[in-house]
Amino acid sequence: MIRTDKLTMRFNGFVAVDKVSFSVGEGELFGFLGPNGAGKTTTIKMLTTLLPPSGGRGWVAGHDIVTESDAVRDRIGIIFQDPSLDERLTATENLFFHAILYGIGRKDAKARIDKALAMVELKGVKDKVVKTFSGGMKRRLEIARGFLHMPSVLFLDEPTLGLDPQTRRVIWEYIRGLKETFGVTLFLTTHYMEEAEHSDRIGIIHKGKLIRVDTPENLKKALGGSAIALRATDDNVKKLANADIDAIREDSSLIVKTEQVDETIKRMVEIGADMMGISVRQPTLEDVFIDMTGSAIGEESGDAMGVMRAAVRMRRMR
């Protein structure tokens, strides 16, 4: 359903997306995992014909994204990262305007709107003005709008960004429902590890380069071993470094990857490391990302523009 061949985007000499090649099968939920600035949104903009690529090629639903852009647009739906509803209109009016843009007749539009609103459990508020909606309700309405014209492929750019964990889980129920009920192909960008876990396959993107594509389980299995977590105190950092025990800082913890858990813990005790609160776990997607890129995903997301956009988004979601 989606295929790219060395897809590239440059902005004034800066390479935002660097010769990215991958494919997404029909009915697949494909997750694009990476921090802000990794090239996720730029890739979506190229695939949805909003931005012409600087190089390479891409196909969506069998159509070239450059030479057959109209055919691509007819077959896709988009849920943008930033809110794009007209908050002065009602839920029904927002969807009806979308139906007009896609040439859906009035009678057919009414039936589709009723079905879409029922799908995301908003039929009871269909005549309420959107500015009265919570952030989660607005996101559900955007999902309904994105699927109103029954696209073959639905692109979701950070669909739960700015939402609380409980609301994120609810939104994910609707996303999975689209795949299971309608068999739609889903291309989703995220920097939330728990969301990437729901994907059939994940593409890890870092600084514009596609590092790896595989299932979540295969990515974790390939890393191998176990992870020992202990408190990231200055004393622990110094003692592990002096003993040549490699550790990566992750939030308030030091993570030591090892194939020999018992031997490594014994060595930590011998060097006098603080073992209070120590835990042992199997590799996570966070560990995979760190191993492949050298940094935690949160450490890559602090550019000023991204922070400003996040603040604006949070205000709109309230």
Model-derived features: positions:
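Conserved ABC transporter NBD signature motif
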Residues: 56-64, 72
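Conserved ABC ATPase signature
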Residues: 129-133
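Catalytic Walker B motif of ABC-type/P-loop ATPase nucleotide-binding domains
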Residues: 154-157
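Conserved catalytic motifs of ABC-family nucleotide-binding domains
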Residues: 150
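Conserved ABC ATPase "signature" region
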Residues: 96, 100, 107-125
